[in-house]
Amino acid sequence: GMEFLGWREVPTFPNVLGHKAVECMPYIMQGFVKKPADVEKGLPFDRRLYIARRVFEQSSDDTYVVSLSSRTIVYKGMFLVGQLRTFFADLQSEDYESAIAMVHSRFSTNTNPSWERAHPNRLMVHNGEINTIRGNADKMLAREENMESEHLKGQLHKVLPAISKTGSDTAMLDNT
């Protein structure tokens, strides 16, 4: 239900990264979606983008969408904080402006580091472990059959499962 405008290859400088980060570096692209005329800006449009993201992610096991939002662009990867600006050419441009930037410099302690597990996530960044994640994930899975949403009318099935069990504890929460 939304018009896809096209892809943009994100310009990067992999030579600033360590060997292991380059070895498992994903292909980094940005996709652009036109807001439908009948959808309001802000949260209504972001809900539609959420559905589109979940459908796209489920199309392939090796697809990870860093962000799909009308409000934010997320840059992340397996590198140190000081390498962020030197890795992404966009962040070196004077044309780029931001009201806020979140940076997290700690790698996961209970899972192997990977590009998709790097912080920040789509909506959050935190320093620690979510100790109740297994119980919460199991409860969400049990409730999926009876879930309803006035905001995702007739499209809730497209975003299920609500929690992907393949990510870190933070990724599970960030996916909802």
Q: Predicted segment positions?
A:
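Conserved short alpha-helical segments that host acidic/polar catalytic motifs at enzyme active sites
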Residues: 1-176
